[in-house]
Regions:
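Generic detector of short, aliphatic-rich beta-strand segments that form the cores of beta-sheets
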Residues: 1-2, 256
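TRNA-recognition modules of translation machinery and tRNA-sensing kinases, especially anticodon-binding
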Residues: 94
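Thiamine diphosphate
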Residues: 3-77, 79-85, 89, 98-101, 157, 167, ...
Length: 266
């Protein structure tokens, strides 16, 4: 069963000689929690691959659609182990290139790592100044700028497949001359470990922030703050094709466009 796989992975890590990896649908990570907690406590290098990361599972319905799970597992990044380090690394990459870097980080780590991946296909994000792969390597900083403007009126944040939705919204906003910055935040823990100067460069003070998450809004609260706006889910999902649910729940460029305009008073 799922619970046993996580326990076996801990045993393999303790034995040594291998880097164990185990996975399941993200919603079923609940079964793994006791073993995951022990891996974090014992500094075990185990990789958890959790897929089907949102309501976009579709017709399987709310029993298979994680909502609160990302907020729960990201708490482990705030919990320190006995070495004084963040006890776990949680990564939710936004596209294939970020996933390459995330896997590289996971292999090179010495503590447990969670990779939270989508079910649906996701196109690579646009390149800003260099090749997309070079830019995606900045995932190692926990958060980085994907789309930018000289004087952004708003900073928009997301992780995973929601970053692409922000890009769609930014295209609509740009048509009205509204300058935006988009930040991909695969790991708040890694981002908080960066120098304050880097954090302030990515998220400048005095610029309003908008967050988009397919989980609980609190998932992004520490980054967006009380004065910004977070579009998230505060309820269970439904059984329907994921594109239908995207529209029902407002996960599209048009909604981002409308909410950001309201947020900045345009």
């Amino acid at each position: 069963c799922i619970r046993d796989r996580a326990c076996i992975a801990n045993g393999m890590a303790l034995h040594g000689g291998v880097i164990p990896a185990c996975g399941t649908f993200f919603v079923f990570s609940d079964y793994m929690k006791p073993a995951v907690r022990l891996a974090a406590l014992m500094h075990l290098h185990v990789i958890y691959i959790w897929t089907h990361d949102s309501f976009r599972v579709g017709e399987d319905g709310p029993t298979h659609q994680p909502v609160e799970h990302e907020a729960q597992i990201r708490l482990m990044e705030h919990l320190k182990n006995h070495r004084g380090e963040r006890s776990m690394l949680v990564l939710r990459p936004a596209d294939g290139e970020e996933t390459v870097t995330a896997w590289k980080l996971a292999i090179e780590e010495h503590r447990p790592v969670a990779l939270i991946l989508s079910r649906q296909n996701i196109k690579n994000l646009p390149a800003l100044n260099h090749s997309r792969r070079e830019e995606a390597a900045q995932l190692s900083k926990g958060a980085y700028i994907v789309v930018d403007a000289a004087k952004p009126a708003v900073v928009m944040l997301a992780s995973g497949s929601e970053v692409a939705t922000l890009v769609e919204g930014a295209e609509l906003l740009s048509k009205e001359g509204i300058a935006v910055r988009i930040v991909s935040v695969p790991s708040e823990g890694l981002f908080r470990d960066q120098p304050k100067s880097y954090q302030q460069t990515v998220l400048p003070q005095g610029v309003v922030r908008y967050g988009l998450t397919s989980g609980l809004p609190v998932t992004l609260l520490g980054l967006v703050g009380e004065n910004g706006m977070i579009h998230g889910l505060d309820h269970f999902g439904y059984s329907a094709p994921y594109k239908v649910l995207d529209e029902k729940f407002g996960y599209n460029g048009q909604t981002v466009y409308e909410e950001v305009k309201k947020l900045i008073g345009k």
